[in-house]
């Protein structure tokens, strides 16, 4: 009887909230929490002054958002919120915001255990719905009605297949990275070189092997720009671990996608928590048959963070790496896969080498065989100020025949045979000169004769 009463009450509440939502929408009295969080602190302060909120100069951005929401609700405004769910051990959860890098804050949205069970929600689900102000004795805004889960109808979330039960396949759909050079002044050929040397597919697990100051961050920015331009259906996440704050700002302003970061002045536990939230969010989206790309800078620093956080096993490898420390970062990187019957998770991460740290070398060696694509950057090329500083002969993709047409693949192999006797610097200089004379790789290949398929592969 009690369960029936609760269900009928819930249905009544949903009907009422729908009617309220429609009424508010007609009057335009709706605040979108996500859009509010994207505002600059100056804009929030101006809005708070209009609402006559006191002591705004002493409030942090999250506290300012909370104060604006509370005041708006008092004035009869409806609030629609969105966030990524983090389920706590007690059974309830909170919607964390990517705008604040999934940090816990006063503007988080509470979700009850009954709502989590009803819709089959898990950590990482992107939930959108109508929220209400905290009642007496409550500290957080609460979710009143679920409108969408992972950008789809909530009913679909309950019947999805768990990520670990999905069947992984080799990448067989190309991820378009080539950007046409429309002007002679354009000097960025990085994505065109990657297309020729190490083509990427949806579900790729790629490592960018990079010594310091070889242009890895700029290369990641170019890849991100190419993905958003050529593959609008892809959900892009850029994950910056242990980075400098100014590089985070630069990435946020240059990339049209979700950029989340944990800077070098934050503890290792924070790096780990952010990485776990990002990978769980990506898995939930893949369960809904979506294509997700995560760009990680850097896998090495993430592994260092896990090494600090993991309980000591008593077995220490060379360089001070705990024997169990690399299991979880490997699980993170290993989540990249192409899924049978739809969906894919692509991870492109940078691995640092030649840093002078023995630990970094050990981490790289552990990750070396786990990827199915490698882009190797060369310090000698970068010292000559030749970018992208890609070592062509050492870079490549496994099973590239699944991604590239046979005729194009044969021409790529011939190109490698021509370049092989050259040194790394001469090879990239030779290729860049040829690319400067053409707008696209298609034009570049038309300049080459159609060869027969090589008998011995590469």
UniProtKB/Swiss-Prot annotation:
Bias (Low complexity) ranges: 10-23
Annotated GO MF terms: ATP binding; ATP hydrolysis activity; ATP-dependent activity, acting on RNA; helicase activity; RNA binding
BP term (GO), one: DNA-templated transcription termination
Segments crossing the lipid bilayer: none
EC number, as in UniProt: 3.6.4.-
Annotated region described as Disordered, given as residue ranges: 1-23
Keywords associated with the record: ATP-binding, Helicase, Hydrolase, Nucleotide-binding, RNA-binding, Transcription, Transcription regulation, Transcription termination
Binding residues annotated for ATP, in chain numbering: 201-206, 213-218, 244
Domain of life: Bacteria
Family matches, as InterPro entries: AAA+_ATPase, ATPase_F1/V1/A1_a/bsu_nucl-bd, CSD, NA-bd_OB-fold, P-loop_NTPase, Rho-like_N, Rho_factor_ATP-bd, Rho_N_sf
Record domain Rho RNA-BD: where: 78-153
PANTHER family noted in UniProt: TRANSCRIPTION TERMINATION FACTOR RHO
Role noted for this protein: Facilitates transcription termination by a mechanism that involves Rho binding to the nascent RNA, activation of Rho's RNA-dependent ATPase activity, and release of the mRNA from the DNA template.
UniProt family annotation: Belongs to the Rho family.
Quaternary state and interactors: Homohexamer. The homohexamer assembles into an open ring structure.
Protein name, per record: Transcription termination factor Rho
């Amino acid at each position: 009887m009690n369960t029936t009463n609760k269900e009928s009450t819930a249905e009544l509440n949903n009907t009422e909230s729908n009617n309220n939502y429609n009424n508010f929408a007609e009057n335009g009295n709706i605040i979108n929490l996500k859009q509010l969080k994207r505002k600059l602190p100056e804009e929030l302060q101006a809005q708070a002054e209009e609402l006559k909120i006191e002591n705004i100069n002493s409030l942090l951005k999250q506290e300012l958002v909370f104060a604006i929401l509370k005041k708006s609700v008092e004035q009869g405004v409806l609030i629609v919120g969105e966030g990524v769910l983090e389920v706590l051990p007690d059974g309830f959860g909170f919607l964390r915001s990517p705008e604040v890098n999934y940090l816990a804050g006063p503007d988080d949205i509470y979700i009850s255990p009954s709502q989590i069970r009803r819709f089959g929600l898990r950590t990482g689900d992107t939930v959108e719905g109508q929220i209400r102000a905290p009642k007496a004795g409550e500290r957080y805004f609460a979710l009143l009605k679920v409108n969408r889960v992972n950008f789809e109808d909530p009913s679909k979330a309950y019947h999805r297949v768990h990520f670990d039960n999905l069947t992984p396949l080799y990448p067989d759909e190309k991820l378009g990275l080539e950007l046409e050079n429309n002007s002679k002044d354009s000097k960025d050929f990085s994505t065109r070189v990657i297309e020729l040397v190490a083509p990427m597919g949806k579900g790729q697990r790629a490592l960018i092997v990079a010594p310091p100051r070889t242009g890895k961050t700029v290369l990641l920015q170019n890849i991100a720009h190419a993905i958003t331009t050529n593959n609008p259906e892809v959900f892009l996440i850029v994950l910056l671990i242990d980075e400098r704050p100014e590089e985070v700002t630069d990435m946020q302003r240059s990339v049209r996608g979700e950029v989340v970061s944990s800077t070098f002045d934050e503890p290792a536990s924070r790096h780990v928590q952010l990485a776990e939230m990002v990978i769980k969010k990506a898995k939930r989206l893949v369960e809904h048959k979506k294509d997700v790309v995560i760009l990680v800078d850097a896998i090495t620093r993430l592994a260092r963070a896990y090494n600090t956080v993991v309980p000591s096993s008593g077995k220490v490898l060379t360089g001070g790496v705990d024997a169990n420390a690399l299991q979880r970062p490997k699980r993170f990187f290993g989540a990249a896969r192409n899924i049978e019957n739809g969906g894919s998770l692509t991870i492109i991460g940078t691995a640092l080498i030649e840093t002078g740290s023995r630990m970094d070398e050990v981490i790289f060696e552990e990750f070396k065989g786990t990827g199915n694509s490698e882009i190797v950057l060369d310090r000698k090329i970068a010292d000559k100020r030749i970018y992208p500083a890609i070592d062509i002969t050492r870079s490549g993709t496994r099973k590239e025949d699944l991604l590239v047409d046979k005729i194009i693949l044969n021409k790529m192999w011939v190109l490698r045979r021509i370049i092989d006797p050259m040194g790394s610097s001469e090879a990239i200089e030779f290729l860049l000169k040829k690319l400067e004379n053409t707008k696209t790789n298609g034009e570049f290949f038309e300049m080459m004769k159609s060869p027969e398929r090589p008998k011995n592969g590469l």
